[in-house]
Amino acid sequence: MTDPFTSDGAKMPPKPFTIEAGRRQVRSFVLRQGRFTSAQQRAFDELWPRFGLEYLGTPRDLAATFGRDTHKVLEIGFGNGAALRFAAQQDPSRDYIGIEVHAPGVGRLLNALEEDGSTHVRLYHHDAVEVLEHEIADGALDEVRIYFPDPWHKKRHNKRRLIQPAFAQLLVRKLRDGGRLHAATDWADYAEQMWDVLDATPGLVNRAGPRGHVERPAWRPQTHFETRGQKLGHGVWDLVYDRDPGVGSGDA
């Protein structure tokens, strides 16, 4: 089946995950058919070769990718790209990798990166779990950021939430000793699950203490999702964890 065209003629990019025959996998996202504009199509056509990383399923040499050997920050599910763009503008000394499965957001950020003249940002349009498992080496990341992941608020859908024990263990493996994990949510129930999972994960130490959270750090701007949540009366929880150098990646 071919991908659908939007009303202005732009064609959606291929599905951002691999499909294994005979295997049904629970994913933390659903691809919703949103508006994909001609400007976003142009971004994929013209800017993807500069900023995009094609998923190959094999370990990637990030130093070669960026042309320098410095710390790497990964943002999973960057949405419209506002937080990633802000961070890259404020911190040119580190390299930034963004992962997002929804094509309109990727196209929007591609255009923004061109406008900024960014040279230290690369993007995946792919499933974050597959990227981490197959393309990111253990200990390669200085920091992982996960801002307002889908809360899957219906109880029967909780298994789709991104923050699960196996995923947390995967993050520990990919973070360098002394690295940092920063997660934010505006759903109290999801914050509770994050604490349940992350506080219990060997190799992660909650910077605010058990079941603690911090004020929004300066490196995270107030996002669209946060603003929307506050209008609905939601609180916001920023959870910051340090990668304990006393726990090896094989122990996670």
Curated annotation (Swiss-Prot):
Gene3D superfamilies: Vaccinia Virus protein VP39. The keyword Transferase applies. Its EC number is 2.1.1.33. S-adenosyl-L-methionine binds at residues 75, 100, 127, 150. Pfam families: Methyltransf_4. It catalyses: guanosine(46) in tRNA + S-adenosyl-L-methionine = N(7)-methylguanosine(46) in tRNA + S-adenosyl-L-homocysteine. Substrate binds at residues 154, 186, 223-226. The active site is at 150. PROSITE patterns: SAM_MT_TRMB (PS51625). Keywords: Methyltransferase, S-adenosyl-L-methionine, Transferase, tRNA processing. HAMAP family: tRNA_methyltr_TrmB. Catalyzes the formation of N(7)-methylguanine at position 46 (m7G46) in tRNA. Belongs to the class I-like SAM-binding methyltransferase superfamily. TrmB family. This is tRNA (guanine-N(7)-)-methyltransferase. It comes from Xanthomonas oryzae pv. oryzae (strain KACC10331 / KXO85).
